[in-house]
UniProtKB/Swiss-Prot annotation:
NCBIfam families: cyt_tran_rel, PRK11316.1, rfaE_dom_I, rfaE_dom_II. Pfam families: CTP_transf_like, PfkB. GO terms for biological process: ADP-L-glycero-beta-D-manno-heptose biosynthetic process. Residues 343-474 are annotated as: Cytidylyltransferase. The active site is at D263. This is Bifunctional protein HldE. The keyword Transmembrane helix does not apply. GO terms for molecular function: ATP binding; heptose 7-phosphate kinase activity; heptose-1-phosphate adenylyltransferase activity; phosphotransferase activity, alcohol group as acceptor.
Amino acid sequence: MKLSMPRFDQAPVLVVGDVMLDRYWHGGTSRISPEAPVPVVKVDQIEDRPGGAANVALNIAALGAPASLVGVTGDDEAAESLTNSLKAAGVVARFQRIADQPTIVKLRVMSRHQQLLRIDFEEPFNTDPLALSAEVYSLLDGIKVLVLSDYGKGALKNHQALIQAARKRGIPVLADPKGKDFAIYRGASLITPNLSEFEAIVGHCEDEAQLVTKGAQLMQELDLGALLVTRGEHGMTLLRPDQQALHLPARAREVFDVTGAGDTVISTLAAAIAAGEELPHAVALANLAAGIVVGKLGTAAISAPELRRAIQREEGSERGVLGLEQLLLAVDDARAHKEKIVFTNGCFDILHAGHVTYLEQARAQGDRLIVAVNDDASVSRLKGPGRPINSVDRRMAVLAGLGAVDWVISFPEGTPENLLTHVKPDVLVKGGDYGIDQVVGADIVQAYGGEVRVLGLVENSSTTAIVEKIRGQG
């Protein structure tokens, strides 16, 4: 399945559900309390993040999609913190504020990146479902997907009215379900329970075959358009009526914190579907997104650049021939992993042993090697009529096959200054016997603090000499 980055900027999504504030107290622990056998945490940082339905909306906005949110809060400091955070992220939030009830707050005490304790401040909201529905109805005509983010806290009491209103307008409804009565989601386009939530409804599943069978029965009973069961380290399974089940393996490189992973799944699904992606592609994107977010601490959102880089890795563009946009993303990803970027350039018309040795030496100057190749027109200008012998596509394909080379890109100019300005490598390498001040682009690299290194050429290795020898024998 080939993946690409959707046009999220044209994919408005409305999220309705249980809004909460995730609050973190960060501090150090160096002693045990004399009052009880518990650690003493000296709090040095307090952090607020949108949680629940607010985190879903935040994730959608972080992908670049227009996001609106309808929910219920108290009339308190926590509600103000939520409102300010969402506004800063570009989320249009419309809250029904209840004066005599607190905003739901999940307080986590953290030390050394570990959660020591969670304290919940909450009461089930006694809301007017008609007022909330009216707010939703007023926004339906401007959206492409409706998300019901249900945590069972009382904001959602009229699921069927919302689902039917959206269906009448042809708007897909995605629901992240809660509780032991999935009948309230009847008619939804897609529901996304995790395995525990799913088995609480259908019973324990011995294997994937039983999961598929029970899932198909549930879809038929509830008239669901599709069912996505998220299964932790086992990935996720997409079920659709009369179609083969789609099992996707987990994509997490490292699991650090699963908080909010379900929010990331449904938000990526919603944004992708709103952008026109087919459901299997949207699920694959959500699977990639979940693999990224579980590597972060606490309730976290995935950004568009992070998802784009994950798509590149999935499509095999982590190495090889890239365009400028792909290369810049790959470089950003490498830098995020503290890797040193090395850059060299040339015509590389007929690749020979001298080239291979030089490129291996260049790669040894850092962690990642970019080889910029003159295109055919620029080679002809530099080398004269009859050159290049090999087209730029063939030259790049051969270079990309070398173990020392990570990324190959072509450029039309005679020299690579434009590329250097965009890429900003840590090290610029050139082969020859001249001084650093004679290396083209050295001034650009040195201006931002990069290094320039000159490597010696391998004797008796020259493309021009090889070409002349071939022509002489012809």
